[in-house]
């Protein structure tokens, strides 16, 4: 049980969806500096958020006792008596009602995927602003850490959580070849569990492939890159967050709702591989002239 004043954050979803909540959590921490923020979710993602100062501690979403909690029956001792909470749960009202009894601050339940046609990160910030006196920056990327190192290599992530979001393996191979012929002599590919499972490694034979052991290692790898190009995925959201110059390809999804945030991020929306490749080169040429 926590004796210090505590505030509960609950998010059990995918990495990219979780990162879209980070501007809201950042703004909340600014107005609640003396509270210990406890996260409930996937251990790997909670630990990552903790490494960026968004959480102080966490509880794995599969921990014993949480089933009754998510059913709105009882609060486990490990959670204690939070003074307030934000719950990103599809059906979170029962849990919210349970937490409101001992709370002195608002307990807010937010639908993770609302019907409103607005960017999710902005929607989350506005939802919190109706309960807490937070200040939302004009650019949500101002909530992200400053980039500390100059990159040494370019990275391509050819996968995502859905095959429909991806282009053909040949597209990424051609892209890597063209990058090497320009200003990026070192170009690597990021392979995670989804790529290992759904992609044919032979399609990338002879390429430099990185397989980060966890998302914290992935964050370190991305931080050291001078360029990142990927699809609509959690990896792309993390690249934008750590400040890597990022180009995100939206083959089937809408960046107006799900777009990666960051200080140097470009969205390209086109299902045609030739057009997408052309747009990438236009973006790189613009960045080169800008620098």
Residues covered by each model-derived region:
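Catalytic machinery of carbohydrate-active enzymes
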Residues: 1-291
């Amino acid at each position: 049980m926590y004796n210090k004043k505590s505030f509960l954050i609950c998010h059990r979803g995918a990495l990219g969806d979780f990162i879209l909540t980070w501007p809201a959590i950042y703004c909340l921490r600014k107005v609640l500096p003396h509270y210990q923020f406890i996260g409930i979710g996937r251990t790997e993602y909670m630990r990552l958020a903790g490494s960026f100062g968004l959480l102080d501690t966490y509880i794995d979403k599969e921990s014993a006792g949480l089933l009754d909690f998510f059913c709105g029956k009882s609060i486990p001792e490990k959670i204690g008596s939070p003074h307030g909470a934000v719950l990103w749960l599809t059906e979170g009202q029962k849990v919210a009602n349970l937490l409101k009894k001992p709370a002195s601050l608002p307990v807010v339940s937010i639908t993770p995927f609302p019907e409103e046609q607005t960017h999710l990160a902005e929607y989350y910030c506005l939802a919190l602003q109706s309960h807490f006196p937070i200040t939302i920056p004009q650019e949500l990327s101002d909530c992200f850490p400053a980039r500390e190192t100059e990159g040494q290599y370019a990275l391509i992530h050819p996968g995502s959580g859905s095959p429909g979001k991806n282009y053909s393996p040949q597209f990424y191979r051609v892209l890597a070849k063209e990058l090497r012929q320009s200003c990026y002599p070192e170009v690597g590919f990021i392979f995670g569990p989804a790529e290992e499972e759904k992609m044919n490694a032979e399609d990338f034979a002879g390429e430099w492939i990185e397989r980060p052991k966890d998302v914290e290692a992935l964050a370190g790898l991305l931080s050291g890159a001078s360029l990142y190009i990927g699809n609509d995925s959690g990896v792309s959201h993390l690249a934008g967050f750590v400040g890597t110059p990022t180009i995100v390809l939206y083959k089937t999804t809408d960046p107006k709702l799900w777009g990666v945030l960051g200080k140097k991020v470009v969205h390209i929306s086109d299902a045609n591989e030739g057009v997408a490749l052309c747009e990438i080169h236009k973006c790189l040429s613009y960045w080169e002239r800008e620098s």
